[in-house]
Swiss-Prot record:
It is found in: Cytoplasm. This is tRNA modification GTPase MnmE. Binds 1 potassium ion per subunit. Its EC number is 3.6.-.-. Mg(2+) binds at S232, T253. The keyword Nucleotide-binding applies. GO terms for molecular function: GTP binding; GTPase activity; metal ion binding. Keywords: Cytoplasm, GTP-binding, Hydrolase, Magnesium, Metal-binding, Nucleotide-binding, Potassium, tRNA processing. One of its GO terms (biological process) is tRNA wobble uridine modification. (6S)-5-formyl-5,6,7,8-tetrahydrofolate binds at R24, E81, K121, K457. HAMAP family: GTPase_MnmE. NCBIfam families: mnmE_trmE_thdF (TIGR00450), PRK05291.1-3 (NF003661), small_GTP (TIGR00231). Disulfide bonds: none annotated.
Amino acid sequence: MNLTFDTIAAQATPNGRGGIGIVRVSGTLTTRVAKELLGKVPIQRKAEYLTFYHQNGNIIDKGIALFFPGPNSFTGEDILELHGHGGPVVLDLLLQRIITLPGVRIARPGEFSERAFLNEKIDLAQAEAIADLIDANSAQAARAAISSLQGVFSTTINDLVEKLTSLRVDIEAKINFPEENETNVSIDKKIIANLDQAILSINKIRTAAYQGCILREGIKIVITGKPNVGKSSIINALAGHEVAIVTNIAGTTRDILREYIYLDGIPVSIIDTAGLCNVSHNEVEKIGIQRAWNEIKQADHILLVVDSSTTKLSEQDKLCNTLIANFPYKTPVTIIRNKADITGEKIGETLNNNYSVITISALSSLGIEILLKYLTKIISLPSSTEGVFLARRRHLEALEITANYLLQCKEKISFPTMLELIAEDLQLAHNALSQITGKFSSHELLKKIFSRFCLGK
């Protein structure tokens, strides 16, 4: 894809003072920028120590210049990198000098990576991996981002796309050449086998992508329950400091409170919510309850808190089942029996009606270590991150759409009259997968993704 752009420039190192600061230039006018600032075009792919000149002939700085001619560069265009001293004034003088040249402007956030994508140097998943590597919160996440950048995720997706294409070819052949009855039986077996294989593949990819998404974005745990059961005390205990105001007055928490902790290197967002009461005549409290339900709908895991001092074990099932009936069907729930310091109940983990029940006293910090170990266990990833790639929520959504279309194909495969519908479902599955790598993506999606990158990337 040969595209014509303005020449762009940006600081590629963070703002502030440092030993080295880098300014990056990319585009058709890069060699002109080099001649104006350096008096020459640097030797290709070799570091040269040169002087950086102002247009009036004064010296701005001295440093290393690197020139990477396109198309064999990161963006696919000519690239110039100037490595000078990392003072903000020096770097600003360099940038201002560069953009005085006609046809050169400051780059938008992520525009270098966007050009690499548009010039087919990387795909969209690899472009996102660049931002993910920069933002990695742990060594595990960094290693997974490198895997994505090297194309592990993309290769997995492209392999499945090829399987779907092959499957669609077989379906189209059956539609277009119905008179070839001799091969119909063998084609049927081949189609069913290939479809089953594709379904197995998408399920395996979804599992790996979910793990990659947890590494990147963490997991969202929502603390909920009736008013005054100790939800705020629990978030304070898990955080290790006071996040929420704790009183004996029911309904103290009216809004959403968030706290971030790390468990085994995985970021965990813990959310305290307003108490879920049946009827409220307070408008502010009503809004808080609605926000609580919104958070519950988006949770990866729900901690349902019960006040053990007012709810006997025999009453717990009825109370919890009433609330759980309104929770998202697939979201796992753990029941927390709080205030054991009042009741004297045994601290620890038990199992009741297939739900894990953890008895604690948040106010006295009794059982908090048990709860933390339990949370670490339920969100833990495989000890080996070999082959693990980072994924985003949009990737999970695309994979879910693909899986649903393939399951629809499976339901229709026994009916010869539905072959055209199967072919259409396969095409839609193909399109959903291709959104991950950017082979089939809207302009608005691309704009949204690259706008979140930092300058100089």
